[in-house]
């Protein structure tokens, strides 16, 4: 029969150098780890998707900015080219305007048969040069009067016209492309008030010769 020694109480095993209170924090730490563990189970693609959406939005904004800048640059280039052409046309038009009196003298000399010899060669060379620069002469007898390109210096009535017509070119007009440098100076004729146009007379004569309308 074993006898228990009085005055001694059994205690749980405690590692050497540790006190019984040290076992309680370990239990608490283990409990915290179990609680924090579910946080690591969140889907990592959620954050990546949000970042991808932000990147796509930023890319769309930058692309729109680039397209706007490209459009502005193209408009700038077209505007510069248009202005360059306009300035060139104005400069050429101003130069050729100074030569119009010389061309008028050449035309009068040709009409009077005085364009001969060396003067003829010089005149033809001048006309060729201004033509290469885009100068065009216009204005012909018999064409309808157009106040945008004709300047009427003489006016009369004629029974053989049906509309205001250029019957004489007093001074030819000149243009460069669509730009009129000088209008053609002309003499015009209008239909005679109360007169029957020649075309109507001829039509009436033809009807009379055919015996009029046949009755059935």
From Swiss-Prot:
Disulphide bridges: none
Chief location: cytoplasm
CDD domains cross-referenced by the UniProt entry: GrpE
Record localization: Cytoplasm
Sorted UniProt keywords: Chaperone, Cytoplasm, Stress response
Regions of compositional bias (Acidic residues) in chain numbering: 205-216
Cellular component, GO annotation: cytoplasm
Residue numbers spanned by region Disordered: 1-45, 185-216
GO MF terms, alphabetically ordered: adenyl-nucleotide exchange factor activity; protein homodimerization activity; protein-folding chaperone binding; unfolded protein binding
Any single biological process term in GO: protein folding
Cross-referenced Pfam families: GrpE
UniProt KW Cytoplasm keyword: yes
Biological function: Participates actively in the response to hyperosmotic and heat shock by preventing the aggregation of stress-denatured proteins, in association with DnaK and GrpE. It is the nucleotide exchange factor for DnaK and may function as a thermosensor. Unfolded proteins bind initially to DnaJ; upon interaction with the DnaJ-bound protein, DnaK hydrolyzes its bound ATP, resulting in the formation of a stable complex. GrpE releases ADP from DnaK; ATP binding to DnaK triggers the release of the substrate protein, thus completing the reaction cycle.
NCBIfam families on file: PRK14163.1
Subunit composition and interactions: Homodimer.
Family according to the record: Belongs to the GrpE family.
HAMAP family documented for this protein: GrpE
Protein name according to UniProt: Protein GrpE
Provenance organism: Streptomyces griseus subsp. griseus (strain JCM 4626 / CBS 651.72 / NBRC 13350 / KCC S-0626 / ISP 5235)
């Amino acid at each position: 029969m074993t006898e228990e020694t009085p005055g001694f109480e059994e205690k749980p095993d405690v590692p050497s150098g540790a006190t019984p209170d040290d076992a309680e924090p370990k239990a608490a730490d283990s409990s915290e780890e179990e609680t924090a563990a579910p946080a690591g189970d969140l889907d990592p693609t959620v954050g990546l998707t949000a970042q991808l959406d932000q990147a796509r939005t930023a890319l769309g904004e930058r692309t729109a900015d680039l397209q706007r800048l490209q459009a502005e640059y193209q408009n700038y280039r077209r505007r510069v080219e248009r202005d360059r052409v306009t300035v060139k046309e104005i400069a050429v038009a101003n130069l050729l305007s100074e030569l119009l009196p010389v061309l008028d003298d050449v035309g009068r000399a040709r009409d009077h048969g005085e364009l001969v010899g060396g003067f003829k060669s010089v005149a033809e060379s001048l006309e060729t040069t201004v033509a290469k620069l885009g100068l065009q002469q216009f204005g012909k007898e018999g064409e309808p009067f157009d106040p945008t390109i004709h300047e009427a210096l003489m006016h009369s009535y004629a029974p053989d016209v049906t509309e205001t017509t250029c019957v004489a070119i007093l001074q030819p007009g000149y243009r460069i492309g669509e730009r009129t440098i000088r209008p053609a100076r002309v003499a015009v004729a209008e239909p005679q008030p109360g007169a029957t146009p020649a075309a109507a007379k001829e039509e009436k004569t033809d009807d009379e010769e055919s015996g009029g309308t046949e009755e059935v």
